[in-house]
Amino acid sequence: MTDADAQLKSNALQRLQGWFANPTIGAVGASAQRSGGVQQEQVHRNMFELLREGESAHDSTPFLEGSLMMWRSSGFHSSQLNTGSNADDAQIATQVRLNGLRSIHDSETQFQDVAPTTHEGQRRQKIRRAQGLQRLLLRHRKHWRSSRIGDFSLILRREAHFHLTAPLLMR
């Protein structure tokens, strides 16, 4: 899956595809290199990209960049997508893991896209993304303490803290 405005490096698709030689990998996503964004966004992206890398090394990440990601057709069925909610990339990554395969972030594979040019445009984009991630985490709250998915339940709990609890504490 790619976004129309994403500019891919020449080997990006082949590199992502190479991960599927490992039969445990069900989804893999690339790293965004944004132009035109505000400095604060880059700091935020760097921090959360480190989380994606750590989650991927430990088990799986529930959130991938939909601008450039791949998944095994056997790892996810379109009927599992909530079309009434946004953050479809995170829905796919999370569901692939819940279906038994790993979902990982490849920081070495990058794509370039352009951030909204106004602060208001960037704010709207961030709010829409955050709402989608919050809805996803709430929909899967029964998995926050599931022994069936092992360490991924801890990752979901941590993400729930970052996206649901921490924003409430900042008010």
Placement of each model-derived feature along the sequence:
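Core segments of transmembrane alpha-helices
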Residues: 159-171
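Residue-level signature of catalytic and energy-coupling elements of molecular machines
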Residues: 5, 51, 96
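Short amphipathic alpha-helical segments with coiled-coil-like heptad repeat character
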Residues: 57-61, 134-135, 169-171
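Long helical/loop segments within the catalytic core of UDP-sugar-dependent glycosyltransferases
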Residues: 2, 10-85
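Catalytic donor/gating beta->alpha subdomain of glycosyltransferases that bind UDP-sugars
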Residues: 20-48, 83-161
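Acidic active-site catalytic centers that drive phospho-/nucleotidyl reactions
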Residues: 3-5, 88-89
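General alpha-helical segment detector with a strong preference for membrane-spanning helices
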Residues: 7-9, 93
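Short aromatic/basic micro-patch
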Residues: 7, 70, 113
